[in-house]
Amino acid sequence: DCPELQAVLDEYHKPVVIQDQVLGELTLDKDYDTFEGEIQWCGKDVSLSLEVNAESKPSWTRARSAAKKLLADCETWDKAMRELAAKNLTELANNWLSQDEENPRDPETDPITEEELTRRISLTSLSVTSGGSFTAWFDCDEMFTDHAVTVYGSLKKGLKTANIEG
């Protein structure tokens, strides 16, 4: 045993927790260089992950600031993300529906519409980088079996793309 090394290891394993007035309690996951927490996004509980450099406190501040900017305008961002997902993925949702033998719904006579897709997806998780880029994961209410809808964007450039992943 090496007491000096053990002291360093003990210090490393101490939890790093930030109490933020807007974002709540954020806990650093040193293995993944992320702060994890829960936020209220448009009235719903959503997991928040801030991608940071664990050794650089300025990156913590930048990631928190970016997340707060998104949260402050969540209604606008939420609407835009849902609309982009609907625009990009409604046709694909109907293709999946046509191949789902267990679902009695016929996409020829009763297709999923953009409005329906917009309504049925719900944000479950948001990841924000210190540079202001973000990824939003949406539950897709079984429209894409057990996959998720992901929307990518940044504060500077707006929304980039929406995909199905998982």
Regions found by a protein language model. Give the residues of each.
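Long, charge-rich alpha-helical interaction segments
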Residues: 52, 57-113, 117
